[in-house]
From Swiss-Prot:
GO terms for molecular function: rRNA binding; structural constituent of ribosome. This is Large ribosomal subunit protein uL23. It comes from the Bacteria. Signal peptide: none annotated. The keyword Lyase does not apply. Gene3D superfamilies: 3.30.70.330. Belongs to the universal ribosomal protein uL23 family. The keyword RNA-binding applies. It comes from Desulforamulus reducens (strain ATCC BAA-1160 / DSM 100696 / MI-1) (Desulfotomaculum reducens). The gene is rplW. Keywords: Ribonucleoprotein, Ribosomal protein, RNA-binding, rRNA-binding. InterPro entries: Nucleotide-bd_a/b_plait_sf, Ribosomal_uL23-like, Ribosomal_uL23/eL15/eS24_sf, Ribosomal_uL23_CS.
Length: 95
């Protein structure tokens, strides 16, 4: 199994993701090759909480242009993790 810290890359802090905190849902950018069970185990191991459900989605990178040069931002994968009632992740508490 992969190292859990390699699976969870960073938390997502947007207006939409902070609105989901009221429903006990936390959003993370995860490794492109990680599946739902790996994400669940990584969150449970790192934050010592119980995960009820994991929803994942692949987000395609956007095309960017600087003058005549075109490029693309990297593709990424987001995971919305629903925790058991009463569990919280401390890094999101100040939002």
């Amino acid at each position: 199994m992969k190292n859990p810290r390699d699976i969870l890359i960073k938390p997502v802090v947007t207006e939409k993701s902070t609105g989901l905190l009221a429903e006990n849902k936390y959003t993370f950018i995860v490794d492109l090759n990680a599946n739902k069970t790996e994400v669940k185990k990584a969150v449970e191991e790192i934050f010592k909480v119980k995960v009820e459900k994991v929803n994942t989605m692949r987000v395609k990178g956007k095309l960017k242009r600087v003058r005549q040069f075109t490029g693309k931002t990297p593709d990424r994968k987001k995971a919305i993790v629903t925790l058991k009632e009463g569990d919280k992740i401390e890094i999101f508490e100040g939002l």
